[in-house]
Amino acid sequence: MTTQAPPTSLLPLSPEQLARLQAAVGEFSPTQMAWLSGYFWGMVNQQPGAVASPAVAAPPPVTVTLISASQTGNARRLAEQLRDDLLAAQLSVNLVNAGDYKFKQIAQERLLVVVASTQGEGEPAEEAVALHKFLFSKKAPKLSETAFAVFGLGDTSYEHFCQAGKDFDSKLAELGAQRLLDRVDADVEYQVQAQQWRQQVVATLQAKVPAQSTAPTQFIAPTQFIAPTQSTTPAAAAITSGGTTTVSPYSKTAPLTAQLSVQQKVTGRNSEKDVRHIEIDLGDSGLRYQPGDALGVWFDNDPALVEELLALLWLKGDEPVSIDGQNMPLAQALLSHLELTQNTTLIVDKYAALSRDETLIALLADKPALQLYAKNTPFVDMVRQAPSDLNADQLVGLLRPLTPRLYSIASSQAETENEVHITVGVVRYDIDGRARSGGASGYLADRLEVDGDIRVFIEHNDNFRLPANPETPVIMIGPGTGIAPFRAFMQQREVDGASGKNWLFFGNPHFTEDFLYQVEWQRYVKEGVLTRIDLAWSRDQAHKIYVQDKLREQGAELWNWIQQGAHIYVCGDANRMAKDVEQVLLDVVALHGAMDAEQADEYLSELRQARRYQRDVY
């Protein structure tokens, strides 16, 4: 149930034995698993010839259930670190992905720890949506026997900071569960907070269950070992063509230095959008990925932006500063280590205090206006509008660490081999007549030369996977750059010779300017690989048409596909498109399935739990 699979060579079981064991215990509750561990321990330690004497059975060890609700991998990595801490403290722990958690068993939990990230406008991570819905439904049980702790991960640049963590924390308490620790709300730079919290959790749980923490041996429940399968691959692992798992040396903190091989604009010259097709050569690195995964891209800020900021603050750039204990010139820190293109309300608040600018100070009292200002005004433009004389250390203290951007992978390695493709919408806008661009998208489109080095890593996404059965129909809904993973899906389905039907819904402003990968889709249709394609061009007529309108228009046939077992995939904008699409799906289910709104919502939740409704939204 964890996403951390140990090397097969370390296990005393063959893969076949491990698979049989997992099949046998797959439906066991944490309490049953704990009892089983004691049962096996007794079998191993029974002395030959000893006569069993009647005795009162020792109470089963209390298992800590650790739920990871991750969107971009941070919550998962933190949960894995905490699991390792708890095991080192000789506590019984069961780490489970929120999407795999059988939440109807939650009333049986005694010790529950949740690590939850937030996406979009306060939404839970995609894998945690079903659990979130259940807890906020009438079916949620009382949890008076449960003690819990919550760590929330978020981003202060968003209005609903750490909202998912807040939701889980408040709802668990409302259902009668007792807090082990106060909830933590962590920003992008969460590592120090997380380390302190992990130590507190271990100490608190050791005090709660002292008998286990002093046990002479460490037992690891079988549910913590998952055989390598397509849906349970650890973040640093990949599946080879032979089905075995290899551990990659590359990660977010240790990226691969690859080379840019292709950078091509795929929108027309008159398009309002600038979309680039990017191909990156992985060389002989052995870096592996699957359709549905994301590519993490580290980037440098625009040198011109760095120079502009230094000039505004009357700084030279050679001032010594420290970043994570590493000494370097200020200019280098601004170029490669600090975020310059994304502002936050917290940064505005701090800068207002330092600059004593009356306009900014007044803005702090108007929360909606403050949020809008932070969203639309990069740091350098805030400094231009409200000049100050920050020194180098004050500047570094204000800015957040630079973080990589994630892009849905637009290729299948079964076809492209040692390449990875992404589809990048370049962010461009003007502030006071000055052209600005996104940090990573501007780097990829404007500054990175072909054959230039680029640091990348794979962010595995086991919540966005093609069905295991190649005969299963697939419905893909991806307007704009949301089409990227479906290009990977179609490449994979074609290479596999999958016989299942494929249906694509795609939309963009104009047919002539914005039909991304048009020739490829036309070929798939001509060769029968793509069964159906429905296109929505929002600006080609007076009345705007979006993919959700096409879904509603095809409601009867959509329901037929769902009844045939189709898997539904949605990729793209989380705040508007994904919500509108979900509402249409609910309407289609209600109308053609003869259900009321509550039944339709439950039906869609069941599809989500069965991995038949998956979303990659941002």
From Swiss-Prot:
<feature type="domain" description="Flavodoxin-like">
    <location>
        <begin position="64"/>
        <end position="202"/>
    </location>
</feature>
<dbReference type="InterPro" id="IPR001709">
    <property type="entry name" value="Flavoprot_Pyr_Nucl_cyt_Rdtase"/>
</dbReference>
<dbReference type="InterPro" id="IPR017938">
    <property type="entry name" value="Riboflavin_synthase-like_b-brl"/>
</dbReference>
<feature type="binding site">
    <location>
        <position position="375"/>
    </location>
    <ligand>
        <name>FAD</name>
    </ligand>
</feature>
<feature type="binding site">
    <location>
        <begin position="405"/>
        <end position="408"/>
    </location>
    <ligand>
        <name>FAD</name>
    </ligand>
</feature>
<dbReference type="GO" id="GO:0050660">
    <property type="term" value="F:flavin adenine dinucleotide binding"/>
</dbReference>
<dbReference type="GO" id="GO:0004783">
    <property type="term" value="F:sulfite reductase (NADPH) activity"/>
</dbReference>
<keyword id="KW-0198">Cysteine biosynthesis</keyword>
<feature type="binding site">
    <location>
        <position position="429"/>
    </location>
    <ligand>
        <name>FAD</name>
    </ligand>
</feature>
<dbReference type="Pfam" id="PF00667">
    <property type="entry name" value="FAD_binding_1"/>
</dbReference>
<feature type="binding site">
    <location>
        <begin position="153"/>
        <end position="162"/>
    </location>
    <ligand>
        <name>FMN</name>
    </ligand>
</feature>
<dbReference type="GO" id="GO:0000103">
    <property type="term" value="P:sulfate assimilation"/>
</dbReference>
<dbReference type="InterPro" id="IPR039261">
    <property type="entry name" value="FNR_nucleotide-bd"/>
</dbReference>
<dbReference type="GO" id="GO:0005829">
    <property type="term" value="C:cytosol"/>
</dbReference>
<feature type="binding site">
    <location>
        <begin position="544"/>
        <end position="548"/>
    </location>
    <ligand>
        <name>NADP(+)</name>
    </ligand>
</feature>
<feature type="binding site">
    <location>
        <position position="618"/>
    </location>
    <ligand>
        <name>FAD</name>
    </ligand>
</feature>
<dbReference type="InterPro" id="IPR029039">
    <property type="entry name" value="Flavoprotein-like_sf"/>
</dbReference>
<keyword id="KW-0813">Transport</keyword>
<feature type="binding site">
    <location>
        <begin position="438"/>
        <end position="441"/>
    </location>
    <ligand>
        <name>FAD</name>
    </ligand>
</feature>
<dbReference type="InterPro" id="IPR001094">
    <property type="entry name" value="Flavdoxin-like"/>
</dbReference>
<dbReference type="InterPro" id="IPR017927">
    <property type="entry name" value="FAD-bd_FR_type"/>
</dbReference>
<dbReference type="Pfam" id="PF00175">
    <property type="entry name" value="NAD_binding_1"/>
</dbReference>
<dbReference type="Pfam" id="PF00258">
    <property type="entry name" value="Flavodoxin_1"/>
</dbReference>
<comment type="similarity">
    <text>In the N-terminal section; belongs to the flavodoxin family.</text>
</comment>
<keyword id="KW-0521">NADP</keyword>
<feature type="binding site">
    <location>
        <position position="341"/>
    </location>
    <ligand>
        <name>FAD</name>
    </ligand>
</feature>
<dbReference type="GO" id="GO:0010181">
    <property type="term" value="F:FMN binding"/>
</dbReference>
<dbReference type="InterPro" id="IPR008254">
    <property type="entry name" value="Flavodoxin/NO_synth"/>
</dbReference>
<feature type="binding site">
    <location>
        <begin position="538"/>
        <end position="539"/>
    </location>
    <ligand>
        <name>NADP(+)</name>
    </ligand>
</feature>
<comment type="similarity">
    <text>Belongs to the NADPH-dependent sulphite reductase flavoprotein subunit CysJ family.</text>
</comment>
<dbReference type="InterPro" id="IPR023173">
    <property type="entry name" value="NADPH_Cyt_P450_Rdtase_alpha"/>
</dbReference>
<feature type="domain" description="FAD-binding FR-type">
    <location>
        <begin position="253"/>
        <end position="467"/>
    </location>
</feature>
<keyword id="KW-0288">FMN</keyword>
<feature type="binding site">
    <location>
        <begin position="423"/>
        <end position="425"/>
    </location>
    <ligand>
        <name>FAD</name>
    </ligand>
</feature>
<comment type="function">
    <text>Component of the sulfite reductase complex that catalyzes the 6-electron reduction of sulfite to sulfide. This is one of several activities required for the biosynthesis of L-cysteine from sulfate. The flavoprotein component catalyzes the electron flow from NADPH -&gt; FAD -&gt; FMN to the hemoprotein component.</text>
</comment>
<dbReference type="InterPro" id="IPR029758">
    <property type="entry name" value="CysJ_Proteobact"/>
</dbReference>
<keyword id="KW-0028">Amino-acid biosynthesis</keyword>
<dbReference type="InterPro" id="IPR003097">
    <property type="entry name" value="CysJ-like_FAD-binding"/>
</dbReference>
<feature type="binding site">
    <location>
        <begin position="70"/>
        <end position="75"/>
    </location>
    <ligand>
        <name>FMN</name>
    </ligand>
</feature>
<feature type="binding site">
    <location>
        <position position="580"/>
    </location>
    <ligand>
        <name>NADP(+)</name>
    </ligand>
</feature>
<keyword id="KW-0285">Flavoprotein</keyword>
<dbReference type="InterPro" id="IPR010199">
    <property type="entry name" value="CysJ"/>
</dbReference>
